Amino acid sequence: MKRFLFFIMSFISVITFAQQPVELPLWPDGAPNSNGLTGGEKEVSPHRISNVTDPTITVYRAPQPNGMAVIMCPGGGYSRLAMDHEGHDMASWFCGQGIT
């Protein structure tokens, strides 16, 4: 766990001044205790994806940060992820409030 946190913090420090979202692999060396599912992601309906086997963390850096940050996890688990309205759209709103 310490190694994972170090990895994430290292990348966040590198992108401190970046304004574009940066996508980082959640588990660069593969998911621990993987269930063995493989295959590509599928768009099952507009703005919903499924079959996520290589999850990522996307960092949205606020243009004028106020020192706060939030972690959002779009709902759906393995079946469907609502990436837009529970992910990208909310991240854009938080960035507008100065929250990374």
Question: Where are the language model's segments positioned?
Answer:
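Beta-hairpin (beta-strand-turn-beta-strand) motif
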Residues: 62, 75-76, 99
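Generic internal hydrophobic packing segments that stabilize the cores of diverse globular domains
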Residues: 54, 70, 87-91
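Short amphipathic alpha-helix adjacent to the substrate-entry channel of hydrolases
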Residues: 83-100
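N-terminal cap/lid segment of alpha/beta-hydrolase-fold proteins
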Residues: 19-68, 96
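Bacterial Sec-dependent N-terminal signal peptides
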Residues: 1-21
